């Protein structure tokens, strides 16, 4: 890699005992579905819910550092670890950052460019690179998706890559315009709720339903 060398330990996953995912699913049912069965197909041929094993997703994020070979290595490691899906992140930097932040000098030892905008751009994969990475994941029989952090990225993931589901970051739980834009794509959504209170979670769920 360019500025730092990744040291990644592969841990083989073991399917958890049934009571773990059953109890978690029961909580979801009681809180948001009024006790109705919480079960749906997240990727083709794979349902999630009370009577199904945990669906384990490897978080690749932007750890590819803008390099396709490293992205493929992350996929290989996800497969070797026993994950069913690998998830990346997609951002349009000039859509989510102000000009002042984009132009800010960024000269730390791990910087990938002289400004923060150039640094962030260097950590992104292009559309064509994402297409290559998705095809590689498919060749390894592992599901592929990504978190879209802006509407342009969501459009690409839905219309360009046709991801099976969207993963929304907890940072965007209160980003109602982005949640609504994503929900209109008609695909399943997995929405993180870190640091949110239950009222905000309810509002987000109501919006996307």
Protein language model features and the residues they cover:
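Active-site mouth loops of central-metabolism enzymes
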Residues: 56-70, 119-123, 143-147
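Active-site-adjacent beta->alpha loops and helix N-cap segments on the catalytic face
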Residues: 168-186, 197-207
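N-terminal amphipathic alpha-helix/helix-capping segment at the start of soluble metabolic enzymes
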Residues: 26-57
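Glycine-rich, proline-tolerant flexible connector loops at the mouths of alpha/beta enzymes
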Residues: 84-124
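Glycine-enriched alpha-helix->loop->beta-strand junction motifs that scaffold or abut catalytic
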Residues: 158-166, 184-189, 209
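Hydrophobic faces of well-ordered beta-strands that scaffold small-molecule active sites
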Residues: 56-58, 86-88, 144-146, 166-168, ...
């Amino acid at each position: 890699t360019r500025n730092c060398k990744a040291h990644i330990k592969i841990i083989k996953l073991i399917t958890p005992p049934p009571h773990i995912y059953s109890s978690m699913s029961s909580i979801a049912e009681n809180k948001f579905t009024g006790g109705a069965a919480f079960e749906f197909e997240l990727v083709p041929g794979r349902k999630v819910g009370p009577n199904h094993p945990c669906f384990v997703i490897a978080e690749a994020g932007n750890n590819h550092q803008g390099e396709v070979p490293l992205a493929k290595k992350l996929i290989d490691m996800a497969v070797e670890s026993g994950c069913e899906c690998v998830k990346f992140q997609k951002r349009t930097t000039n859509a989510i950052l102000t000009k002042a932040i984009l132009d800010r000098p960024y000269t730390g030892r791990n910087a990938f460019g002289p400004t923060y905008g150039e640094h962030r751009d260097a950590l992104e994969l292009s559309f064509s690179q994402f297409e290559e990475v998705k095809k590689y994941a498919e060749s390894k029989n592992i599901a592929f998706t990504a978190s879209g952090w802006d509407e342009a990225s969501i459009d690409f993931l839905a219309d360009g890559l046709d991801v099976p589901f969207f993963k929304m970051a907890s940072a965007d739980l209160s980003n109602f315009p982005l949640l609504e834009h994503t929900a209109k794509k008609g695909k399943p959504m997995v929405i993180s709720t870190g640091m949110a209170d239950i009222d905000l979670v309810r509002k987000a769920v109501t919006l996307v339903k």
